[in-house]
């Protein structure tokens, strides 16, 4: 699925299936596809958030500076204030997130259905 954004002179297509997260950069937004792959968009994060809501994509805004692809989250650490995402080349990308946003992410993920095929809720003994 593509997110189509446009201004007067340009059209931008964001590949939502492979995007990991969006990060606010002043009045712009960077979309990250991997460790060294990013695209600068001339739109604020609020504009991106509104556009994503229309797409019904599995993205959620956390804090003032991040919108994260929830399908790519593999680990959240409140202690380290880190979210680890799985890239399309099956490598892990840790990103630093503000403590309040980490709590939002953890609360959201805990509220989701506890078990999906192959997952065990609650951890512990296997």
Where are these regions (language model features)?
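Basic, polyanion-interacting recognition surfaces, primarily
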Residues: 1-126
